[in-house]
Amino acid sequence: LIYPATDATMSSPSVQQNAHAPILTRRSMVTFRDHYLGPGHDRRDPLVSPLFGRLDGLPPALVQTADLDPLRDDGIRYAEALQAAGVSARLTNYLKVPHGFASMPGAAPAVGRQHRWELATEVRSALSAAG
């Protein structure tokens, strides 16, 4: 999971801390959420906010977050919740990069290489275990 949105209530501290971050702002998050959910939808519904759902029995997860991202704490909280539910979850928070860094490998080459290596290693490991 790369910078996952797991809480449509937008109650994570990083939503405020990085409200004016490059690429993804709090304002754009509110716009996206409101268009997606429409009026009257429960923002804690696990179908849109998996952080509030049952997590036991889910497959192992790699959660990658960006330090300068309003969604950073969503990912951190989700990884912690998965672990608390007995799910194998690994978390990496990439420092000094914004949301979207994985799509911009030239913006922070060393971070991009590390992200891609970690992701490929985890996928390879999961496929080896499954097959």
Label for each model-derived stretch:
Residues 1-131:
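Alpha/beta-hydrolase superfamily serine-hydrolase fold, recognizing
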